[in-house]
Amino acid sequence: MIQKNWQELIKPNKVDFITHGSRTHATVVAEPLERGFGLTLGNALRRVLLSSLRGAAVTAVQIDGVLHEFSSIPGVREDVTDIVLNIKEIAIRMEGEGPKRMVVHKEGPGVVTAGDIQTVGDVEILNPEHVICTLDEGAEIRMEFTVNTGKGYVPADCNRAEDAPIGLIPVDSLYSPVRKVSYKIENTREGQVLDYDKLTLNIETNGSVTGEDAVAYAARILQDQLSIFVNFEEPQKEAPQEQVAELAFNPALLKKVDELELSVRSANCLKNDNIVYIGDLIQKTEAEMLRTPNFGRKSLNEIKEVLASMGLHLGMEIPAWPPENIEDLAKRYEDQY
């Protein structure tokens, strides 16, 4: 009895991942959800996506000839404060643990980009076109970056080590690979119920992880955190093999017709004709259906299309139909249709 608290809640029968041809943008659509669960899951996933996924970021930079972030560099158009702001936007993917070192050394004139940085084997720059600073004729700059892994946002003050050498400038670190997350909740239909939730998540990452993987990681984090609150063991329910073998027809025939996505008119006609299960419906011929009051050619075509999507059609013969224990069988095989 207690299992009905979660077993009888409707779950999404599909989750669509739309990449828009980009590694950094994705849309995730899940439907149907119980009313209210779109907001519950959408908000929880958004918070975890933005705060709890691990990534890599620059934690500090040392620039030759510069003692602090309020300096300026001869021949460099940006001051050090602007350079540090640009460094914060470098997108990095790093395998393994840190910290790691990266170096850039360039002479002017020209633009210094993230692609000019010399990296070690397990560190990759994901936005090489990102501009760090601009050099005039005769200018030269050398910078050494410290890169580490972490999660969430860490301010520069927390990246300042007590034994840091003079000239090492700490940087605000945004470790999260997820840059933006938004979601919206819409009504969706399942059978004759029109007010289930449809959850749409829009995700933007820095490219170190895809939107689909980011959602999977966030869901796994939530699953792990919530599991501690489950204080019981759920008994495993396995259908005996002999019970499965006794069924002489497609289990889909045990599905009720009011669970099909039919128009209200078609559904009412079936109800008035005492057609409860799909097994009842497919044994009807087209001529018999057209003799049903208020049932026209449009409703007939609609039903034929729905049945065809299930590999069924009108006028089928089911010798073992209806079974004596049809309601018990419908409950037993509900996971198979």
From Swiss-Prot:
Function: DNA-dependent RNA polymerase catalyzes the transcription of DNA into RNA using the four ribonucleoside triphosphates as substrates.
Molecular functions (GO terms): DNA binding; DNA-directed RNA polymerase activity; protein dimerization activity
Chain segments carrying region Alpha N-terminal domain (alpha-NTD): 1-233
Reactions performed catalytically: RNA(n) + a ribonucleoside 5'-triphosphate = RNA(n+1) + diphosphate
UniProt keyword annotations, A-Z: DNA-directed RNA polymerase, Nucleotidyltransferase, Transcription, Transferase
Region (Alpha C-terminal domain (alpha-CTD)): 249-337
Enzyme kind, highest EC tier: transferase
Gene Ontology terms: cellular component: cytoplasm; DNA-directed RNA polymerase complex
EC number: 2.7.7.6
Family per record: Belongs to the RNA polymerase alpha chain family.
UniProt note: domains: The N-terminal domain is essential for RNAP assembly and basal transcription, whereas the C-terminal domain is involved in interaction with transcriptional regulators and with upstream promoter elements.
SMART domains linked to this entry: RPOLD (SM00662)
Protein name: DNA-directed RNA polymerase subunit alpha
Transferase as UniProt keyword: yes
Assembly and binders: Homodimer. The RNAP catalytic core consists of 2 alpha, 1 beta, 1 beta' and 1 omega subunit. When a sigma factor is associated with the core the holoenzyme is formed, which can initiate transcription.
A biological process term (GO) from this entry: DNA-templated transcription
